[in-house]
Amino acid sequence: MSRDFSRTVRVADQIQRELALLIQNEIMDPRVGMVTLTGVEVTRDYAYAKVFYTTLGGDENIQLVEEGLKHAAGFLRSQLAGKIRLRVVPQLQFVYDESVERGMKLSRLIDEAVGKA
């Protein structure tokens, strides 16, 4: 059981590395600017992969980046097939990662609480 889990994690890490390079070097869509991939979760059968990302800018920019990534998902999957040796290359689903924003808000609240004490 743990061996299967570790392989899933290794595949997710490899997908994250390859996608980061592909987005940086191959995607020419102006909507997809400064994107940072924060994590990838792959299903056990490798059919689907959730790709978590962050980007700079407000809500409008987040929406534009998401549209650009969804538009490029097929291209990225086909490029990924040539770089990763898997029987099935997962379908990519891009999800905005709000954990960074939540962490900054919590840090700000802690700083305010410490400042008042």
UniProtKB/Swiss-Prot annotation:
GO terms for cellular component: cytosol. One of its GO terms (biological process) is maturation of SSU-rRNA. It is found in: Cytoplasm. One of its GO terms (molecular function) is ribosomal small subunit binding. It comes from the Bacteria. The keyword Cytoplasm applies. InterPro entries: KH_dom-like_a/b, RbfA, RbfA_dom_sf, Ribosome-bd_factorA_CS. PROSITE patterns: RBFA (PS01319). Keywords: Cytoplasm, Ribosome biogenesis. One of several proteins that assist in the late maturation steps of the functional core of the 30S ribosomal subunit. Associates with free 30S ribosomal subunits (but not with 30S subunits that are part of 70S ribosomes or polysomes). Required for efficient processing of 16S rRNA. May interact with the 5'-terminal helix region of 16S rRNA. Belongs to the RbfA family. Monomer. Binds 30S ribosomal subunits, but not 50S ribosomal subunits or 70S ribosomes. This is Ribosome-binding factor A. It comes from Nitrosomonas europaea (strain ATCC 19718 / CIP 103999 / KCTC 2705 / NBRC 14298).
